[in-house]
Regions:
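Hydrophobic residues embedded in beta-strands of well-ordered beta-sheets
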Residues: 150-153
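Polar, S/T/G-rich
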Residues: 1-141, 148, 200, 210-212
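Surface-exposed, non-catalytic interaction/assembly patches
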Residues: 2-7, 20, 121, 134, ...
Length: 227
């Protein structure tokens, strides 16, 4: 540890000296930062996104863009996270472990290659409520949060094993006096053809363009042919 007192603790600073005669106006400086390290499982190689053997529940420090461990850092960090204000806060690391594995699974990238299902490269600069910030981060991996009895619970929208199947055989329905069904077990609704979307324009921050906001056009050819 250093005993020296820093003027800007926990801050990254860059200074650039340029010749003003070379520019008609002050140039715009863009910096691509790697960000801070966070705790990740000891059996996890963040660089290769691989997991080795069984995890014993311990952590190591590493840089990662896996949103599960970035989410955990925001919750448990005592300097700027939720734990600074709610000391008793806790979160299930074992469920986060399954979330992180799902995030790291490779999926098609639309250009003939693959990429991790979910990544997170975020620069938090605006204040917000705890619930708002955590929900925004959880949305990076299709997650939802709720708080109960000092513990933060997290669930992820992903394919899972069937818990219960429902059909007319095991659902109560209203039967009229004549024996006919007065109210069916299930009701089905649809949408108008004009309301069905076949094209989307998505705005996102493109890392190949210094994270500038770009608009991506995507269409569903199958739905276009159908509707």
């Amino acid at each position: 540890s250093l005993d020296e007192k820093f003027a800007y603790p926990n801050t990254g600073i860059i200074a650039v000296k340029i010749d003003a005669r070379q520019f008609s106006a002050p140039p715009v400086l863009s910096v691509k930062i790697r960000g801070k390290r966070v705790q990740v499982p000891t059996n996890y190689d963040a660089a290769t996104r691989t997991y080795t053997g069984l995890w014993d529940g311990t952590f190591q420090m590493a840089w990662t863009d896996n949103p599960a461990w970035i989410f955990r850092d925001i919750v448990l960090n005592e300097r700027f996270g939720v734990k600074r204000y709610v000391n008793s806060i806790a979160i299930d690391p074992w469920y986060l472990y399954t979330v992180s594995q799902y995030c790291d699974e490779l999926v098609p990238n639309g250009s003939g290659g693959t990429e991790p299902r979910f990544t997170c490269n975020v620069f938090l600069q605006n204040p917000g409520s705890v619930y708002q910030v955590l929900n925004s981060l959880a949305s990076c991996f299709r997650g939802l949060i709720y708080y109960s009895e000092g513990e933060l619970y997290l669930t992820q929208d992903r394919e899972q094993e069937v818990v219960q199947q429902f059909s007319e055989a095991n659902v109560i329905q209203d039967v009229a006096e004549d024996g006919g069904v007065s109210s069916p077990c299930f009701s089905y609704t649809g949408s108008a053809r004009a309301a069905r979307k076949t094209v989307v324009l998505a705005n996102w921050d493109d890392p190949t363009q210094v994270y500038s906001s770009v608009t991506e056009y995507q269409q569903d050819d199958e739905l276009l042919d159908k509707f």
